Amino acid sequence: MRDSFHRQITYLRLSLTDKCNLKCGYCWTSFQHDCPAGSAENGRLGEFTSFGYAERLMSVRAAAKVGISKVRLTGGEPLCYSGLVDFIADVKRVPGIEGVFLTTNGTMLADKAADLKGAGLDGINISLDTLNRDKYKRLTGFDMFDKAMGGIQAALSSGFGKVKVNVVLIGGFNDDEIGDFVNLTRDEPLDVRFIELMPMTGSPLFGKEAYLSGRVVLERCPDLKSVGMDDPSSVARLYALGGAKGRVGLIEPVFSSFCDKCNRLRITYDGYVKPCLHSSDEYSLVGKSEVEMERTIRNAIDAKPREHGDLRCLRTDIDGVTTGGRSMRRIGG
């Protein structure tokens, strides 16, 4: 289905839970942990909402009927969701769904990567913002750096064709590690993707002084050469070092907006369709039949704005961007 600006909407980001076993400063708007001691078991408490397993699967079927073909499962931390493996297998069976992907912090991935692959998961994005153990603990609140690195290796060993490492660029925190991240691509078939920080209103740690343009990566690593994009709807411009097994991606929502080719919708963990990340507009799927969900999703697609309202402000004043009153963990990363 096309929206009112003729963009083909094919990509659904579906949040399974708002719980997470880490506590990264740019994702949270308060300092209260809801998964003490990094526990995945505690995170599972978040599943018991009025929008559960059956409703989420129904929403995928409804979305597929309007043209969604790619689903990315997010959180919170989706590996906190105890039904994840079965859910992936069920989504893969939905007619029209061609790919199912996962975004995770990787800390619980080592023991689950093989099962996820067996369920039909097509690719994994792993969020990792530093290669320094002390900084990792400072950012996330937990000393789980080794588990995150083990998750990356488990994903590679399990045969996933697409393993991506997402790095949020944070001025004064990890910009001294850009070269180290780029070097990860030399010997491993990883896509390391640098993402511009979009400071969210209410984020306790990072303001406009932390923003860095993705172009700083090219300035620090002049040996990177452009290799284009994976497809026209991709948000990452890709580069590579000569002879490297992997690639480097730049995702620049501030410096180089991609609203004009946005092909995605989000469904929050509690059952609301968000046509735009930075819009307060939400469309409830709670308590609806599959037919009603399909109608609601169509309405949300029709309501997608040309670009998010904060975009112009971002380019001139990086004080903070609204997400419709929700922190990122309550929307879906």
Predicted features, each with a name:
Residues 22, 133-134, 257, 283:
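Glycine-centered loop/turn positions within well-structured domains
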Residues 4-52:
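Canonical Radical SAM [4Fe-4S] cluster-binding loop centered on the CxxxCxxC motif
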